[in-house]
């Protein structure tokens, strides 16, 4: 659990893009090493601006501890890129998520059908209803539903994990 705190710390740093986090992880063995690195220890990382590197001086773990507490309370699991269960289907894309949040039964990601949901942030009530119904039916049939949980269509799908007992991954 302690190491997981540093993964959450890294992913919740405001102003640091996912790509920047991936670049840092290419230079450091773990987020914990990034956390404890002194500014002079940071190598020049191509694609990481000095203002982004300065964000790493925020050593507060309050956000991370809050996220971990909410995950524990909400029965939400987390998978880091270094976890054996992290899906190869994601690991091998250009800009994979550093950390996955999931709810429901932990699937065998690379062996099960998955459907990804991408949609508008401003949607009609009909659009939300249609996405929820489609996601529900797919999950009921056994598909893993993957959503970025952004505002709008994506976020509407978090509710389907409970009745279907299937996973929703963000």
Name each model feature, range by range:
Residues 77, 144, 166:
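Residue-level detector of anion-binding/catalytic polar loops
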Residues 122, 150, 167:
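Short, glycine/serine-rich, charged loops/turns that create anion-binding
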Residues 1-136, 140:
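Short, positively charged patches
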Residues 158-170:
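Single conserved hydrophobic/aromatic residue that forms the stacking wall/gate
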Residues 135, 139, 143-161:
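Phosphate/pyrophosphate-binding betaalpha-module
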């Amino acid at each position: 659990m302690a190491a997981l705190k540093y993964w959450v710390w890294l992913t919740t740093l405001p102003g640091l893009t996912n790509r920047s986090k991936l670049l840092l992880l290419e230079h450091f063995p773990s987020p914990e090493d990034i956390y404890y690195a002194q500014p002079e220890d940071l190598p020049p990382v191509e694609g990481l601006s000095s203002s982004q590197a300065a964000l790493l001086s925020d050593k507060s773990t309050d956000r991370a501890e809050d996220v971990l507490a909410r995950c524990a309370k909400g029965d939400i699991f987390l998978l880091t890129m270094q976890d054996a269960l992290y899906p190869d289907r994601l690991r091998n894309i250009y800009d994979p998520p550093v950390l996955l949040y999931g709810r429901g039964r932990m699937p065998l990601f690379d062996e099960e059908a998955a459907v990804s949901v991408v949609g508008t942030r401003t949607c009609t009530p009909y659009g939300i209803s249609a996405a929820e119904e489609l996601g529900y039916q797919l999950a009921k049939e056994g598909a893993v539903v993957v959503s970025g949980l952004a505002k709008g269509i994506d976020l509407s799908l978090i509710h389907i994990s409970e009745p279907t007992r299937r996973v929703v991954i963000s």
